[in-house]
């Protein structure tokens, strides 16, 4: 948000409250509660691991694509994208490499999210590699924390495409709410 505003772009409205649901399976109860209290709600999902039936139930509570339902894939033109795919692969890989220094990232495509023809986001590809090569669980939050620190320390390191993707996402969220 800070980086976008520092570059003259619109950030998220201060009226917006981000409420993690703990996964798509918990989405329906939260969305029902929000709509029952006449609060505007929007849902932002990755395109992977959405339990069957969740997307089908959302229209009954007036949340559907184009009306409150956003998918990361809409902002990177890549099916299965997650928030990590909004960043340039190089920037994300540098953070991953600092957390997992022995990880052979050369086995993962360095193409942009648009160029990758895979239906899983970059974090899922890295998780597979970590689990296969190192026999441990990929901890996305550790990479996310480092990513956040790097953005705060050196906001100029975010490339224009990343800024544009977040700007479009925030504009859409602001429009919905």
Identify the meaning behind each predicted range:
Residues 3, 90-91, 95, 99-100, ...:
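Generic structural signal for hydrophobic core residues of well-folded globular domains
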Residues 46-138:
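Activity-critical C-terminal alpha-helical subdomain
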């Amino acid at each position: 948000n800070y980086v976008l505003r520092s570059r003259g772009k619109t950030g998220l409205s201060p009226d917006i409250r981000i409420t993690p649901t703990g996964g798509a399976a918990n989405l329906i109860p939260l969305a029902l509660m929000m709509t029952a209290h006449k609060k505007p709600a929007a849902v932002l999902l990755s395109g992977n691991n959405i339990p069957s039936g969740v997307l089908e139930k959302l229209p009954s509570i007036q949340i559907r694509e184009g009306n409150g339902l956003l998918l990361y894939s809409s902002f990177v033109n890549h099916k299965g994208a997650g928030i990590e795919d909004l960043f340039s692969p190089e920037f994300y890989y540098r953070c991953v490499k600092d957390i997992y220094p022995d990880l052979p990232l050369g086995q993962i495509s360095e193409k942009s999210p648009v160029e990758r023809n895979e239906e899983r986001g970059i974090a899922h590809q890295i998780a597979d590699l970590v689990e296969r090569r190192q026999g441990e669980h990929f901890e996305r939050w550790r990479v996310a924390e480092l990513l956040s620190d790097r953005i705060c320390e050196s906001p100029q390191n975010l490339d224009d495409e990343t800024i544009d993707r977040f700007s479009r996402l925030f504009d859409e969220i602001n429009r919905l709410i």
